[in-house]
C-alpha cells in the first residue's frame, strides 16, 4: 500500500492577550487536501478531496516552575470521492469534529522536569481515515506501530519524567503512554519506555525512544505479539 497527500492551507491567528505569564489567541484556518491511497500497485485505491475550515482557541500560562498550554478547536469540512474501491461510503460528505490538547510542565529543580500531556478528539459524524484520531506511533503510544488503532473519537495521554544531563544537550526520559479509541470497537493501548533527546540551538535535534507494551502485546497491524518498538527522529536546525 502507498499513498500521497497534498495539503494547501491559509490561516490567520489573532492575539487577544499576550504577556510573559499568559496568552490567549484565536485562529481560523482554511484547508484543502488531495488524498490518494493505493494498494496492489495502484490497481485498487481511492482518490479523495477534502475542504475544511478550522477554528481554534489556544494559549498558555506560566510562572517560576509551572507551564501550561492548551488548545480547543472545531473542524467542519466536506469530503468528496473521485475514485473509490474500498473507502467507507458513510464518511463522504459533510463532517464535523472537535479537538483538544493540553500540555503541562513542572520544573522539579534545575535538572528534573515532569511533563504531562493529553489530547482528544470527538467525531460528531463518521470520519474518513484521513480525519480520524490515532493513538499509536512516534507521537502517541510509542510501544505500537503507526496506525495500530484509530477511530473518530479518542483520548491520548503521556506522563514523562526528564533528566537534563549536564551541558551536553542530552536529556534522558522515562515515560508511560496510554490511549483509547471510543465508539464502535473500543480499543485501548498502553506502553512504557525510555528515551534520549539531543537538542541545542541551531544544531541537530535528535530523539530516540524505546517502548514496550503494558497489558496486551498483540499488534493487529503486524499480526503478532510485539515485545518492543524503537523510534529515531533526526532534524537539522538552521
PLM feature segments, named:
Residues 86-238:
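C-terminal transmembrane beta-barrel domains of outer membrane proteins
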Amino acid at each position: 500500500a502507498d499513498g500521497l497527500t497534498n495539503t494547501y492551507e491559509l490561516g490567520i491567528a489573532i492575539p487577544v492577550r499576550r504577556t510573559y505569564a499568559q496568552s490567549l489567541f484565536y485562529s481560523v484556518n482554511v484547508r484543502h487536501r488531495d488524498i490518494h491511497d493505493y494498494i496492489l500497485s495502484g490497481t485498487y485505491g481511492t482518490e479523495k478531496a477534502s475542504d475544511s475550515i478550522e477554528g481554534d482557541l489556544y494559549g498558555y500560562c506560566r510562572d517560576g516552575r509551572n507551564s501550561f498550554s492548551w488548545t480547543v478547536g472545531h473542524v467542519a469540512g466536506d469530503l468528496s470521492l473521485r475514485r473509490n474501491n474500498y473507502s467507507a461510503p458513510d464518511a463522504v460528505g459533510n463532517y464535523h469534529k472537535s479537538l483538544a490538547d493540553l500540555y503541562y510542565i513542572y520544573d522539579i529543580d534545575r535538572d528534573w522536569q515532569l511533563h504531562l500531556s493529553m489530547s482528544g478528539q470527538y467525531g460528531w459524524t463518521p470520519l474518513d481515515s484521513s480525519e480520524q484520531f490515532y493513538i499509536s506511533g512516534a507521537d502517541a503510544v510509542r510501544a505500537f506501530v503507526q496506525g495500530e488503532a484509530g477511530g473518530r473519537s479518542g483520548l491520548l495521554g503521556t506522563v514523562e519524567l526528564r533528566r537534563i544531563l549536564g551541558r551536553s544537550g542530552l536529556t534522558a526520559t522515562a515515560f508511560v503512554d496510554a490511549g483509547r479509541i471510543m465508539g464502535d470497537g473500543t480499543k485501548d493501548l498502553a506502553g512504557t519506555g525510555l528515551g534520549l533527546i539531543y537538542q541545542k540551538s541551531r544544531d541537530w535535534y535528535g530523539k530516540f525512544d524505546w517502548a514496550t507494551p503494558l497489558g496486551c502485546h498483540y499488534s493487529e497491524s503486524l499480526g503478532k505479539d510485539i515485545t518492543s518498538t524503537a523510534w529515531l527522529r533526526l532534524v537539522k536546525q538552521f
